[in-house]
């Protein structure tokens, strides 16, 4: 499983083993199948290719299977370990015998590439041999410890799913190397904060997998050493001591990984100060810096909003000021919202509040799924909320998805998360089953009282709000509590079955219903959520969206592409608050989804100079034209064109 908190003393709920939960239909089944059949093989080809990524070739050079120099990115090792996770999950979920064998071959290669002292970073190993001046731990931007962290996590996943120790043994040797490194850092006071601290989560998972308390101590030590960094910066969240953190800032991936790691530590050790930090920074994100799509990190490159003239204040791929949420230039790195998922998931296990899964689901169904093309072969590194026909400036990344870019961290991170997505469906505590992300599924549940049954969820969510729960293969003679999440966006609905029949109220939104099922053998509980189309407006401090609204239905954010309207330009479309939306089944590239058909106002801008900075206002009236909205996750899978989520509202008196 992704995180094994079954023995974590401060976990209120625990994840089900991912191999015991399977999507059986609907959107998540389709996305998992696409990941297994298309994305994982595509990424394998990229990593195997000497000419594209050079990643596997670097391991071969370290192992003595090939000759040559290091090539590719410094974080390629870690990205490959992330792909290994996706491969392990999909191979064993689908019983892919060939992929299982290839995984073991890769593990053998990784083991032979490792140095006798446990060190394993291909750039440095090759550099030591060629004498090109590259040194171990000489530059935090070489991502060595980031690579270690993803190795730790992949090795734990491999052990839990296969029962084999070969990958875990390699990871343990590297953890031993890291232990000596931190002991030396404490002795000398020479401390650097590792960028993108995946190793916090990785080390805690090593402890959970092996029971060796050295790894938990090492995670605590690694986090505490942040406070000893000299010349820290907001970009790396180490300018001030961790326990003084109140705002989310700096590089968004690094921030979300940091707080996910701290949450992992808090699941194992009580620390009220760290919990206070987690609460403050979470509120900073959710209340003032999170995009409607669940995207994290508004800025490309710039200066920290909280920096001073003489401070280290450069930031990149970062959170900005409160309410600084541009649309065309929204950065929203895919790895950042994935990190937000990891963080929210751990926070939920600390305190099972519906908000954490509301945010997790928003990130997963909108930004994260949008980062992958419907055919599973092309990726967004950054996730804009608006695309214009053309820009007068050049952004770092392409405005459409790419099969491969040099900075390839997001695709394997996305692949492993989709491969593991069924783990976000259910959690358990005592004699309770808690729902996380909804989707048609079957879960083999074993409760702490020894009771076992298969929980069957039947639904077309997120396109339909009716969710039915039944049970089969029941081996329990005691009541079961079904804890059902009512998302914060659901203003109504109903619950039926188990003697709990009633209409839902506004007070139920954003809470868990506790449904006592006295006879699990005859379980039949139906939750119906309000799926009315919603107009959503932002705080007026979000300057780019003043006077505008977005359209949501259920957990999905909707957008419009230029191909789906007869307007000359998407900027000409204004929302009519009296317009009716008709949900209709729609397909793009053979993938089924629910679109919204409507008529909206379009303004006549025939005399408008779209190249002028300023010009006299000319109004020639409005007309009504057909508009189709599609789920944001499905955009950029047809012809290139405009896209936008936020539209000006045509208020009437």
Model regions and ranges:
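Glycan-recognition and catalytic cores of secretory/periplasmic carbohydrate-active enzymes
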Residues: 1-653
């Amino acid at each position: 499983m992704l995180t094994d908190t079954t023995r974590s003393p401060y976990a209120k709920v625990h994840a089900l083993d991912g191999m015991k939960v399977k999507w059986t239909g609907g959107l998540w089944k389709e996305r998992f199948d696409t990941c297994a059949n298309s994305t994982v093989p595509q990424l394998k080809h990229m990593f195997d290719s000497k000419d594209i990524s050079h990643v596997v070739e670097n391991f071969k050079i370290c192992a003595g299977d090939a000759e040559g120099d290091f090539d590719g990115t410094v974080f390629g090792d870690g990205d490959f370990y992330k792909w290994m996770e996706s491969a392990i999950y999909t191979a064993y979920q689908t019983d892919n015998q060939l992929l299982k064998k290839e995984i073991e071959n890769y593990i053998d290669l990784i083991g032979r590439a490792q140095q006798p002292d446990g060190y394993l970073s291909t750039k440095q190993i090759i550099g030591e041999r060629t004498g090109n001046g590259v040194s171990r731990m000489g530059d935090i931007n070489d991502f060595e410890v980031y690579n270690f962290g993803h190795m730790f996590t992949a090795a734990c996943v491999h052990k839990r799913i296969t029962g084999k120790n070969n990958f875990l043994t390699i990871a343990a040797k590297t953890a031993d190397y890291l232990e000596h490194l931190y002991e030396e850092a404490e002795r000398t006071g020479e401390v650097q904060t590792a960028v993108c601290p995946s190793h916090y989560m990785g080390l805690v998972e090593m402890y959970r997998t092996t029971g060796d308390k050295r790894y938990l101590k090492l995670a605590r030590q690694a986090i505490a050493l942040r406070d000893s960094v000299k010349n820290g910066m907001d970009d790396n969240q180490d300018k001030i001591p961790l326990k003084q953190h109140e705002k989310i800032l700096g590089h968004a991936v690094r921030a979300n990984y940091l707080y996910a790691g701290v949450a992992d530590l808090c699941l194992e050790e009580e620390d009220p100060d760290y919990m206070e930090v987690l609460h403050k920074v979470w509120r900073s994100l959710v209340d003032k810096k999170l995009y409607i799509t669940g995207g994290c990190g508004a800025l490309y490159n710039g200066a920290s909003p909280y920096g001073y003239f003489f401070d280290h204040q450069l930031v990149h791929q970062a959170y900005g000021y409160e309410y600084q949420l541009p649309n065309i230039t929204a950065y929203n790195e895919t790895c950042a919202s994935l990190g937000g998922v990891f963080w929210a998931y751990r926070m939920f296990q600390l305190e099972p509040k519906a908000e954490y899964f509301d945010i997790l689901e928003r990130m997963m169904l909108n930004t994260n799924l949008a980062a992958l093309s419907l055919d599973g072969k092309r990726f967004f590194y950054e996730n804009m909320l608006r695309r214009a026909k053309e820009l007068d400036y050049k952004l770092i990344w392409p405005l459409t998805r790419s099969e491969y870019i040099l900075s390839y961290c997001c695709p394997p991170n996305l692949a492993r998360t989709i491969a593991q997505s069924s783990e976000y469906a259910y959690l358990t505590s005592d004699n309770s089953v808690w729902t996380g992300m909804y989707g048609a599924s079957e879960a083999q549940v074993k409760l702490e009282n020894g009771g076992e049954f298969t929980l069957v969820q039947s639904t077309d969510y997120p396109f339909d709000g009716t969710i039915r729960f039944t049970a089969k293969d029941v081996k329990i003679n005691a009541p079961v509590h079904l804890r059902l999440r009512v998302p914060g966006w659901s203003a109504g609905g109903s619950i039926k079955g188990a003697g709990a029949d009633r209409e839902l109220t506004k007070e139920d939104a954003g809470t868990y219903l506790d449904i006592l099922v006295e006879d699990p053998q005859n379980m039949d509980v139906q939750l119906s959520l309000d799926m009315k189309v919603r107009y959503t407006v932002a705080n007026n401090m979000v300057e780019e969206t003043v006077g505008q609204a977005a359209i949501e239905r259920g957990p999905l954010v909707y957008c419009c592409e230029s191909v789906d309207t007869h307007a000359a330009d998407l900027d000409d479309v204004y929302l009519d608050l009296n317009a009716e939306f008709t949900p209709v089944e729609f397909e793009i590239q053979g993938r089924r989804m629910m679109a919204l058909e409507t008529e909206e106002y379009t303004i006549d801008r025939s005399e408008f100079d779209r190249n002028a900075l300023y010009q006299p206002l000319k109004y020639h009236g409005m007309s009504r034209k057909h508009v189709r909205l599609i789920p944001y996750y499905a955009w950029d899978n047809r012809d290139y064109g405009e896209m936008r989520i936020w539209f000006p509202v045509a208020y009437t008196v």
